[in-house]
Amino acid sequence: MNESFAQLFEESLKEIKTRPGSIIRGTIVSIEKDIVLVDAGLKSESAIPVEQFKNAQGLLDVKVGDQIDVALDAIEDGFGETLLSREKAKRHEAWLILEQAHEKSETVIGIINGKVKGGFTVELNEIRAFLPGSLVDVRPVRDTIHLEGKELEFKVIKLDQKRNNVVVSRRAVIESENSAERDQLLESLQEGIEIKGIVKNLTDYGAFVDLGGVDGLLHITDMAWKRVKHPSEIVNVGDEINVKILKFDKERTRVSLGLKQLGEDPWIAISNRYPEGIKLSGRVTNLTDYGCFVEIEEGVEGLVHVSEMDWTNKNIHPSKVVAVNNIVDVIVLDIDEERRRISLGLKQCKINPWQEFSETHKKGIHVSGKIKSITDFGIFIGLKGGIDGLVHLSDISWKISGEEAVKNYKKGDEISAVVLQVDAERERISLGIKQLEEDPFNVYVSNHKKGAIITGIIKDFDKKTVTVKLSDGVEGNIKFSDSSRVNSEEIIKKLKIDDTILVKISNFDRKNRIINLTFHILDENNNKKDLKNKINVKSNDESFSNVMAEAFKAAQNTE
């Protein structure tokens, strides 16, 4: 009875072990071209595809006589054969390893082999796992090319075989490994020391360098003394480099690194090497809207401002003058060692057309050119050398106002003018059109003396002043305040615009270009005939003196 029960129990165990899906032990009997024969102690040997016995490199990792685990797919497939699977057994083993690693917080070996939304895929010995982007490293990593295809250690942080879900972390491994090393490194870090590190990640603003458990930032501005557009110009991921610790915040575990600080600062005593005014050759490294940068030596660049590129066009775009990598001649204009700035000039290497004009055109010389533009304040005339001269409104005409005179000109007209003043330093040329003729005021003054009795035409008047036109471009003023004997109100009643009157020159105001006058009235003792001969009064104008005489008499009678 007991023997039969023991026999039945053993048989029941065999049944359990030989159910489909069970993992059983087998021995490799032979290896053929396409199949491997395995004896698992069943009714017959089973043929398993040889591909299931090859490793990642495509090589067989078994030999005849090896004992292996296989999965039982079917005891009888309908043709009297038992179906076994080495692949499913491997997968079963892989899950067991992952479960054990997860329970004991051990690391597993895997290979990053792809990128998916939110992270990467990792091959863990037949099992596909997910590696979140945030768990690749202790710092954000945008590019994992340097990690892909390599065997790396990971920690299993989530495992669900039913859902075939495995989540791993490389960051946890790094933090665990670096903990002791990191503490030791943090104790030894000091500002100013030189240390080795490996570039682990690049960003637009710099590179993160692994110093051995602690990452430091090598900012793009501390990579080289010269201008660097992108960190990849200086370093690459995986490079082992020497760096200098510039700043170290132990509390926040932040390390600022410098690469350029390992070399000599080219800005030291730069003013001695490049005094103002020296001419140099350099390479154009960059163009901007406001100018171009020129490298005059390794690590030293200067700015040619757009205003220093061309003598005649102040708003020209740099791309119209130079291109990146052009070798150009420049003049050092200014050096600010403290702010590390050099101002360079491109136009100064060429002839200054303003200076040239100043040397060849003295005051009074006549010039000609086309009108380039007309503004509210004058006329710009194009001159030789691509420069302009300005005729101010006040220098257009002797006889009429500038606002009226400018209406007689238009853009494109060819006109002549006289050079009045040249300021080469301020790049200004003053021209005059009216100066092409004699000044009618000066002519009039030279032909008339103080005290002379003359005729004039009333142009305008008010309670204080009478404006008298004496000739083209020449006017005089009569101020009632200068005639204390008269009543201005009575005089004003007799005055009419365009009346011809007799006046006397009291003085000349050359500064304001005005001739001061007084009324001249004939009395009974005056010899009208002699007066007419002196001032050439025509017969039809003879009455003007009598009219004014009567006006003065009336004014005096009211007193």
UniProtKB/Swiss-Prot annotation:
One of its GO terms (biological process) is translation. The gene is rpsA. Keywords: Repeat, Ribonucleoprotein, Ribosomal protein, RNA-binding. One of its GO terms (cellular component) is cytosolic small ribosomal subunit. It comes from the Bacteria. Binds mRNA; thus facilitating recognition of the initiation point. It is needed to translate mRNA with a short Shine-Dalgarno (SD) purine-rich sequence. Residues 21-87, 105-171, 192-260, 277-347, 364-434, 451-520 form the S1 motif domain. Belongs to the bacterial ribosomal protein bS1 family. InterPro entries: NA-bd_OB-fold (IPR012340), Ribos_protein_bS1-like (IPR050437), Ribosomal_bS1 (IPR000110), Ribosomal_protein_S1-like (IPR035104), S1_domain (IPR003029). GO terms for molecular function: mRNA binding; structural constituent of ribosome. It comes from Buchnera aphidicola subsp. Schizaphis graminum (strain Sg). This is Small ribosomal subunit protein bS1.
